[in-house]
């Protein structure tokens, strides 16, 4: 029996996941794996955070934090984001696991012992200003192949070619922006030319997407060169050699990161009490395992050339139980890029749909549905808010949701919620049952060919067929004159509903589960159709999907996108909505904070009302009701359930209060600790994301920056502010 080892590209633990990431490597893999599980296949789905990339060191340097603090924060955030998006990894690990250090060093030593490494003293990028060797990604310049400017020194994001700082045109330091120099430094290189012929023969036999196969073969034809696999960096896996010129150096992340697929698999099976089970997935023991890597287009060279070469360089794995070669990738489904409103996603300019923020406003199934319908399988595609709204409302709500609701409404209204017996079938009835069988076959074939967009379209065509069938049979009319005919119509409609409950599972797991609940089923879902028996009792109908409103989209843009990219948010709002509608939504959603929120995008906005030529006043008696006191922050912790909140403890002299404060974007924990602050002490306690807040810190907010209010000299804790 064939078994599947499925991976998604390891995300860098230096920032959150955006919709482009999800559509590229994670949602496609999840659809594929969920289908295999429904088929009863032997499949393991692995991923984890890549925690030694130079972007992590770069971010830590910029923020004055340690790399470990960065990776711990984003590992947890990314893991929770995937859970919320219903990405069903068997295990989500990390490359800071001890097993990953051990295995990565083992891979290096095996390649070293097998003669595939060579030490060379070469010129390495060095910044005279920052007094440090620069990893490739810390160097930016113009790509010599396509002329794209501001490309990092490891790969061009435009043409996809691997780069080195030496070949960049006008290279400069990404930290300070100054021109760089090159200094001598010893490093180990992998002799890629050792594997060129073997790689070519192997790739020619693989069932890869044409865009992947053609790109990779052309690179091999141009000639493979030696590539450095060690770096001058203080964060990463140490080079496992006792050589003077290797001290303080680490394994290059592009060498050790893909080894994470194996180390995370080992950790997974260790944790479930099967420490040797990983071998049948990663070692070619019986030729029955298919290793499938889901990636984005930018990762093609690393997974199709370098990663297989590392596995070849290791040679045979051998222990007391087994001796075997490593399994090479069976397939590498690589998606193209997703754009946002016609522009490339940009994390630096905050032009992105951050998944954890999007899921604060919209259900996971909505995001999964839309991203699947526009999935960039063979060409770049675009995320558009207007298209998102239309597709959800017309396809999910009006088509799928409407059909399920109609069928359940009729069985409850005319048959007390019991599946009726079928009478004699006519041609359309038989066509409906055949359509169900065809849908299972065709959707499965499309998924196995990584055509997820077409597969979902085929599922939705069954819902459309159901609506047409229902309209043609007109059970609202036959119910008055032909109970048997009506029963047949309702029975077959419910069979279609059950089929949809299974077919939707890979794409919309929440909707699938809800349909299963409404049908009152406890059987395990399988990728096969077994009819609902007559006499089975179903539940009363519930709304499956709610329409997306303009107000929701306006709120999302104002509350999330405008914080990081106010100009981009303003352009979006002006493109789709009247300003008065934006103002109305801001007032409804943000209340007294509406003007502050709106001024992020409309600098000239002013909402304060005037009465008889004078500003409205607050009465002194109302102000006097506030109990404002001086306190001192004595503890700062991350909120366990929110990305932007701290849980702080404030000493008010006679008591210590716990407060929840939205200051994470503006202050580091160490900047808050021991700071004197002003607290609203008699504010009604309120739970924020599951933690009670006993007051509020006062701060000034000009729409861009936030500054805490504090006394200009030390006073007694608990002193009143008058």
Curated annotation (Swiss-Prot):
Main location, first listed in the record: cytoplasm
**Which amino acid positions bind Zn(2+), per UniProt?**
143, 146, 156, 159
Catalytic activity entry:
tRNA(Met) + L-methionine + ATP = L-methionyl-tRNA(Met) + AMP + diphosphate
At the top level, the lineage of the source is: Archaea
Q: What class of enzyme is it?
A: ligase
The question of whether Nucleotide-binding is a record keyword is answered with yes
Residues binding ATP: 347
> What are its cofactors?
Zn(2+)
Q: How is the cofactor bound?
A: Binds 1 zinc ion per subunit.
Cite the tRNA-binding domain residue spans from the record.
Answer: 622-722
State the span of motif ('HIGH' region).
Answer: 11-21
The EC number on file is 6.1.1.10
What are the protein's UniProt keywords? Aminoacyl-tRNA synthetase, ATP-binding, Cytoplasm, Ligase, Metal-binding, Nucleotide-binding, Protein biosynthesis, RNA-binding, tRNA-binding, Zinc
What's in the GO CC field? cytosol
Entry annotated with the keyword Metal-binding: yes
| Residue interval(s) of motif 'KMSKS' region | 344-348
PANTHER family to which the protein is assigned, alphabetical: METHIONINE--TRNA LIGASE, METHIONINE--TRNA LIGASE, CYTOPLASMIC
What does the protein in this record do? Is required not only for elongation of protein synthesis but also for the initiation of all mRNA translation through initiator tRNA(fMet) aminoacylation.
* Family under the similarity heading: Belongs to the class-I aminoacyl-tRNA synthetase family. MetG type 1 subfamily.
Subunit annotation:
Homodimer.
Protein's UniProt name: Methionine--tRNA ligase
Task: Tell me what organism the protein belongs to.
Answer: Pyrococcus abyssi (strain GE5 / Orsay)
Gene behind this chain?
A: metG
